[in-house]
Design a protein with these regions (language model features):
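Charged, amphipathic alpha-helical linkers/stalks
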Residues: 31-46
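Short, non-ligating residues that shape and space the ligands of small metal-coordination modules
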Residues: 12-13
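Cys/His-coordinated zinc-binding microdomains
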Residues: 7
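Boundary segments of small protein-protein interaction reader/adaptor domains
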Residues: 123-131, 135-145
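Long, low-complexity or tandemly repetitive, helically biased scaffold regions used
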Residues: 93-115
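Cys/His/Pro-rich metal-binding microdomains
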Residues: 4, 16
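Single conserved hydrophobic/aromatic residue that forms the stacking wall/gate
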Residues: 151-160
Length: 160
């Protein structure tokens, strides 16, 4: 386990071992990394293939699920991983049957990020945590029925 995304981080350097200061277990941290890697794989799949109507929603929900202290339920994380992989199958049908894996839709191994040069790791972590933060706002907006920035403009004040 390696986690350093919250203010409770042990010694201001990250939690390691069997559990974090916040109570997150090592297995849960691994599942969050697996979910993040699956989300990266789905994003790669969408680079050259059209998304479905649900793709963005699943990505936002998946990112929100990995935010600190949002969800430490291992079964929920496993279900979200399965949903992300199922969505990838809809975006790129038949990819799993390909005899020549190209790597364009593979899940990303988060260990590569955590074991990268510290400057690269820091930059990628900053980007990831920022995207997760934006996903939190987007997730709550979706739950409330908002779908775009149009609602922040004067157009939202106009009556139909």
């Amino acid at each position: 386990m390696f986690c350093f995304q919250c203010e409770q981080t042990a010694g201001c350097s990250g939690c390691t071992g069997a559990a974090g200061v916040c109570g997150k277990k090592s297995v849960t941290a691994d599942l969050q990394d697996e979910l993040t890697g699956a989300l990266v794989g789905l994003a790669h799949a969408c680079m050259n293939n059209p998304k479905t109507e649900q793709t963005d929603r699943i990505i936002i929900e998946g990112l929100f699920t990995t935010i600190t202290n949002v969800n430490f339920n291992d079964e929920t994380l496993r279900e979200m991983i399965a949903r992300v992989r199922e969505e990838k199958g809809r975006v790129v049908p038949g990819c799993a049957a390909c005899m020549s894996p190209c790597g364009n839709t593979s899940d990303y191994d988060m260990k590569r990020m955590w074991e990268a040069d510290e400057d690269i790791r820091s930059l990628k972590s900053l980007i990831l945590f920022g995207i997760r933060g934006m996903a939190a706002y987007a997730y709550h907006a979706m739950v409330l029925g908002y779908t775009c920035l149009l609602y922040t403009s004067d157009a939202a004040d106009e009556e139909d």
